[in-house]
Amino acid sequence: MSHDDQKSRGAADSGRRNFLKLPLAAGAAGGLAYLAYLSRAEPGKEPKPDPAPRRPVLDEYDEKNIKLAHRVSAGISDDELLFLKQIGLRWARVEFQPDEATLDNMTRVQRRFAAQDIKIFSAVNYVHRSPKIQLGQKGRDADIEQYQVFLRDLGKLGIPVADYDFHPANTYTTATVERRGYQAREFDLDDFRKRVEKRRFEREYSAEEIWDAYTYFVKAVLPAAEKADVKLALHPDDPPVAKMNGVAKIFVHHDGYKKAEEVAGTSKHWGLTFCVGTWAEGGDRMGKDVFEMIRDFGKRGKIFDVHFRNVSGPLPRFVEAFPDDGYLDMYRVMKALREVGFRGAMEPDHVPQLAGDKGIRPAGTAYCIAYMRGLLRRANEEVG
């Protein structure tokens, strides 16, 4: 072997070693970028530099950037918390059951996350799903008061966002199916109507009744949120079907969000958890598409956090998919969010199950975060 051949082989071996050193979370994004860089080189020569210097790229952890995060339960294990740190996450959404959402317990949970350098960006207290609240039943004031205390406690802890939804009697899925070899949730509207649907409560509830219940709830909790400086982030109805199990659903269209915004008035503490997957499920029936929603609410600072999920196609049937495996162009989504200056948290949503995955599904989670990180870095290069 000639001296030049040895030099070329040595450079290639060095490149492979450097690629293998990439952390798991950056493998899918940074690794492919590095291989693309090597591919620009002719055999035995150094890679050619970019023809023009690129603009400075926003650091991933800059406060002005999108905050990659994950949604987890308050009882997450120490190993799972360490895993989140290992894949480079510094933010999380934490979900509390009503009996877990005390100030003492939330303080303990926050300290556990802080020990791994992870901040809690948003929190959920599932007391908001109380049928008394969401159906406007007698006794709801006690549950609403519990939610008000929760908001005050988030303010004391410096947790800036409270996520919630408003869809009593919901059915998320009709089957678990295989897609590209992984396990994912399917919703088939025809199957739901024929096989799954049944009246959930003692009677049916109209859209007017659910609007009355939502208005009562928001009027009661929004002042507490404003006083605590905590933002209320409303998730759309998933799936966006107008009525399920005998109860109307009101956040299945752009008009529903606009009406909810009117209920909240000019408050800066009311906004959206914008679930990209849910909006993609609805397709044309949503009134505005994903990108129009981002421009409408995002430009006005009304998107507080984002659930980043793709689906196989719109209703009447869809399968939840990894971000690279659905019909929506997720790079366009990421770029659109950067263009409107979104700087909230972004979490993978309903992570599909890869072989051997359990708990928080670390393999699937790492896959999603790596893909999202790659899209975000590219969007930052283009947007600045």
Task: Mark where each language-model region is.
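C-terminal segment of N-terminal export signals and the immediately downstream linker at the start
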Residues: D13, Y34-R71
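Active-site acidic/histidine proton-transfer and metal-coordination neighborhood
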Residues: P23-A25, G31-L35, Q134-G271
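Short, acidic/polar
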Residues: S73-L84, I144-L151, D289-I294
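Acidic (Asp/Glu)-rich catalytic clusters
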Residues: L81-G88, D104-F121, G155, P223-K227, ...
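Gly/Pro-rich active-site loop or hairpin
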Residues: Q97-P98, K243-K258, V263, T278-R343, ...
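Structural preference for beta-strand elements that scaffold enzyme active sites
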Residues: N65-A69, W91-R93, K119-F121, P160-D163, ...
